[in-house]
Amino acid sequence: MVEVKKHKFPGVYTVIDDDGSERIATKNLVPGQRVYGERVIKWEGEEYRIWNPNRSKLGAAIMNGLKNFPIKPGKSVLYLGIASGTTASHVSDIVGWEGKIFGIEFSPRVLRELVPIVEERRNIVPILGDATKPEEYRALVPKVDVIFEDVAQPTQAKILIDNAEVYLKRGGYGMIAVKSRSIDVTKEPEQVFREVERELSEYFEVIERLNLEPYEKDHALFVVRKT
């Protein structure tokens, strides 16, 4: 018998399978909608979507014991690199109808894949834009509570800082999934992560750093706060 329990993070749930294994899930904001072929569980009249950590860096971080998760019900999120919406759909479940996600994506082709999802998930606003040029979408994005960045570029840290300068509320949080090989393939990942942490700490208070293996090789997730 499958069982669903509340996770320590509001809006996230733990699904305990028959064999005792645990997975994370979110309560489906749009019952009946599957976004990326994920498994769906029915429990006490509600529908829960299993959050696959192999397909989502944020999901991987939670599975790896993330301590700080500023994405909560009712919060506004600027999502840099929203892609086709795998992770964003779970964030959409969490923030709910009271929250909002402003999703920036550079590729028109990829953004088109998001359209059928957002037709029903009205709390996601898809925006075609370049995360390296935050002023481009100033007319569309207000000040937000959280910025989440998943952009595999050498200037990852600068992208977060530049967007936080324009869009992040004081006291707001940033989360960034850093792929060391996108920054410098010649250096050891640990060295790259230290350099990124140093760069981030010049603008933010760095609260947490977490390795994403075994789900993502050479990746770390940083949680930072704008003071």
From Swiss-Prot:
- Report the EC number(s), separated by commas if there are several: 2.1.1.-
The residues that hold S-adenosyl-L-methionine are 86-87, 105-106, 130-131, 150-153
Write down the SMART domains for this protein, in alphabetical order.
Answer: Fibrillarin (SM01206)
> Which superkingdom heads the taxonomic lineage of this protein's source?
Archaea
CDD domains attached to this UniProt entry: AdoMet_MTases
Which GO biological-process labels does this protein carry? box C/D sno(s)RNA 3'-end processing; tRNA processing
- GO MF annotations in UniProt: histone H2AQ104 methyltransferase activity; RNA binding; rRNA methyltransferase activity
Q: Which Pfam families match?
A: Fibrillarin
Keywords for the protein's UniProt record, in alphabetical order: Methyltransferase, RNA-binding, rRNA processing, Transferase, tRNA processing
* Family named by the database record: Belongs to the methyltransferase superfamily. Fibrillarin family.
**Which proteins does it associate with, and in what oligomeric form?**
Interacts with nop5. Component of box C/D small ribonucleoprotein (sRNP) particles that contain rpl7ae, FlpA and nop5, plus a guide RNA.
| Described purpose of this protein according to its UniProt entry | Involved in pre-rRNA and tRNA processing. Utilizes the methyl donor S-adenosyl-L-methionine to catalyze the site-specific 2'-hydroxyl methylation of ribose moieties in rRNA and tRNA. Site specificity is provided by a guide RNA that base pairs with the substrate. Methylation occurs at a characteristic distance from the sequence involved in base pairing with the guide RNA.
Q: Which PANTHER family match?
A: FIBRILLARIN (PTHR10335:SF17), RRNA 2-O-METHYLTRANSFERASE FIBRILLARIN (PTHR10335)
Q: What is this protein called?
A: Fibrillarin-like rRNA/tRNA 2'-O-methyltransferase
Q: Which organism is it from?
A: Pyrococcus horikoshii (strain ATCC 700860 / DSM 12428 / JCM 9974 / NBRC 100139 / OT-3)
Gene designation per UniProt: flpA
